[in-house]
Amino acid sequence: RDSEASSAIEASSTDHTVVSTVHGDGGRKAHQRIAFLAQKKEAKNDVGILMEQAALAFPVIVFVHKLANNARKVMEITECVVHDNGELEYRVLYRYRIKRNLYHGGKFTIEGEFVKENTMSEELREKLLRGGVPGPLLERFMGKEMTA
């Protein structure tokens, strides 16, 4: 996995579309895991630099979790904005909020809903447009009309 993490960062950094999986508990921890795996291959690189590279390569993290009822559920969609000074800002865009857990007759039932917590950055919006995501679809996620 260490060479795969390094290759994925490199490919994504050259504007190739890369979709990958990594075991981690949400946005920041996923980037940490990618950075630690990449550091195994490139020990000379600082983990902080690798974290920034991972965040630039993978600005969106989709966190999936297996719940008590054995269902896999998208729990969070998080964007990481890398500021000019290198600071990483994690914004949860959507979160699955569990309202209640029920246990009846040996079976778990989990009730919840998706909640929009933040709007994606303009940088991510532009990147998605360049990548071919239709404007009307992005409008739904931005929560506003897009200008030409």
Regions of interest found by a model, annotated:
Residues 1-57, 68, 75-79:
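Conserved P-loop NTPase nucleotide-binding/switch module
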Residues 61-63:
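Short, well-ordered beta-strand core segments
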Residues 73-148:
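NTP-binding/hydrolysis catalytic cores, primarily Walker-type P-loop NTPases
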